[in-house]
Amino acid sequence: MFRIESARIIAGVTRIVRDVGIAEEIAQDALVTALEQWPQSGVPDRPGAWLMATAKHRAIDLVRRKETYARKLAEVGRTLEDEPPPAEPAEPDDIDDDLLRLVFTVCHPVLATEARIALTLRLIGGLTTQEIARAFLASESTIAQRIVRAKRTLAKAAVPFEVPYGADRGARLSSVLEVIYLVFNEGYSATSGDDLVRPALCEDALRLARVLAALMPEEGEVHGLAALLEFQASRIATRTGPDGEPVLLADQNRARWNRLLIARGARAMSRAGSGPYALQAAIAGCHAAAVRYEDTDWAAIATLYGRLVQLTPSPVVELNRAVAVSMAEGPAAALPLVDALAREPALSAYYLLPSVRGDLLERLGRPREARGEFERAASLTRNERERTLLLRRAARL
C-alpha cells in the first residue's frame, strides 16, 4: 500500500517544503508513525489520506521551525494544523497536480539520465534502493549515492516544483517519457548480466506510463508510450525459454501473448498522436495483430520505420528498418542498407549490427561470412544469454 501511496505523499509534501529529499524523509516518517499506531488503534478507513495528512502536518511543523511562523504560514497558505489526522482526503485533482509536478521535477534535465532513472524509480515508483540496485546490477551504495547526489542537484539548482508550460513543456515532457522508456527497455532486453529479461522493471515502467497517461490525458505522445509498453509487455513471457534462453520472435508461442495487454495497447493507441512513441507503438501493434509470424505485415512495418527515421533520424532506427525491408523484400534488398550503416560511428560497438548482418548473410547462403558476423556480435554484447545464442548460431554454420 505504501508503495502505491508514497509518490502522492512525497508530491504533496514537496509542494510545502520545496525539497524532494526532505519530502521523502517526511513521507517515510509518516509510515513509521503508522506502523507504530495502527496495530493499537486499527487501520483507518482511508489509510492513504491518514498518511497524507500526517506527512503534511510534519511538513508544516518543519516549515514553522525553520521560518518565521506568520510569514511562512502566509506563504504556503496551509490550514492543516487545525485538522487532526486522520483527515478528509485532499481533492483528487490537487493530489494529481502535485504528483505531476513531482514527475517533472525528478526528471528535470539538470540531472544526468542515470540520476533521473534512479530518482524516478525511488520517489515515483516506490522502489527501495536495494531493488533499484538489483535491477541495474549495481551496488546498493552506488545507487544510494546517485540518489543523494540527484536530490542535492535539484536543491542546489532550485528546480521549481511545477508543471512546465509554453516552449519548455515539450522538451521537459520528452525527458519524462525517455526515463520511462529507458527503464522499460532495460527490463525488456537487459544490456548486461545473466538474464535477458527483467520483468519487474517492465512492470514498474508500465505502471509509471499508465499513471502519466491518466495525469496527462491530452498528451498524445504519453498515450503513444503507454501503447508501446502495453504491446511490448504482452510478449515478455514468451521471449525466454524454460532455462532463460532467448526465443526469437519467429519462434514465440503467440497463444501465450497477453491478450489483455494487447487490448489495453490498442485502447491507448486510439488516443495516441503521430509522434515517435506513437509510431513505435504502431509497429508493435503490427506484430501483435499477426496471429502467425508469417502473417506479419512487414511492408507496413518498413513504412512506419521510414516515417520514424524522418521524425527522429537514428542509425538504430535505420537498422530496424533494414530488418523490416529484409522481411518485406528479401535479404538482398536489405544488405546494402546494413552495409551503409557499418560506417556509422554510433554503431561501431553495437552488437545488433553484426547480428543483423549475419542473419542476412545466412539467408543469402553465405554461411562462412555469416559465422564471422555472429562471432563478432557475440564479442560485443554484454548479456550472457545473447552471447550464448549468437555463438550457437555461429556454430550451426
Residue map of PLM features:
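Residue-level preference for hydrophobic side chains embedded in well-ordered alpha helices
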Residues: 1, 5, 9, 30, ...
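Amphipathic helix-loop-helix modules that constitute alpha-helical solenoid scaffolds
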Residues: 66, 74-131, 138-306
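"A position-specific structural signal for the A-helix of alpha-solenoid helical repeats
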Residues: 225, 229-232, 280, 284, ...
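Σ70-family region 2.3-2.4 aromatic/basic alpha-helix that recognizes the −10 promoter
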Residues: 31-35, 45-74, 151
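A short, charge-rich alpha-helical start-of-domain segment used by transcription regulators
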Residues: 1-11, 21-24, 170-178, 182
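Short, charged helix-capping/linker segments at alpha-helix termini
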Residues: 10-27, 37-46, 140-141, 191-195
